[in-house]
Amino acid sequence: MKFSVLALAAAASLGLAFTTHRPAPMHPTETAANPGTVYDYTVKTIDGKVVKLSKYKGKKLLIVNTASKCGFTPQYKELEELSKKYAGKVTVLGFPSNSFNQELASNEEVAAFCEKNYGVTFPLFDTAPVKGDDAQPLYKFLADKSKNGAVGEAPNWNFCKYLVDEKGHVVAFYPSKVKPSDPELVAAITK
């Protein structure tokens, strides 16, 4: 009996992470008094250079936690296509992470994998955690509605996406199942 209850609980929690329908993005219903922006953060590129995210002011950003050994890894191809097609509208930023135990061992391996298999040219950053107490500061901000004013959702798997407006404010969260080519996501980028 105890095993059945535990098995049902485990199955239910997995079902929440991998819903079969495409959930709508989370949009803000209330705003923090003074929400921060992603421009307040400095990150390290995949080759170790320090970058202030303020360098992307004036463009929408699609911030994605990525992994090389995931069922969603083929989304790299669509992310690259989106990055090229809407280069004047959005910049895709890829943040490799082993938070779900599906990333390669080093930044060098990740960069080589992305270039060889998907021709990735959009910016990739240092492999770092994206959830929990160990999450890198940017991802703590992205997941905390009291800080960003809009979204209170941490990545529950690889290839979750945060849309950031031209002023650096987080405006939407898209779970892994929402592909970069999803019409709703593309519409949000192009409006």
Language-model region placement:
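Sec-dependent N-terminal signal peptides
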Residues: 4-12
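N-terminal "domain-start" segment that seeds a small globular fold
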Residues: 22-54, 136-137
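Amphipathic alpha-helical repeat scaffolds
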Residues: 45, 65-69
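Conserved helix-turn-beta segment immediately C-terminal to the redox Cys motif
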Residues: 59-61, 69, 73-95, 114-118
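Thiol-based oxidoreductase modules, predominantly thioredoxin-like and allied folds used
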Residues: 89-107, 121-132
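Short, internal strand/loop/helix patches
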Residues: 109-158
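Thiol-/selenol-based redox modules, centered on thioredoxin-like
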Residues: 140, 144-191
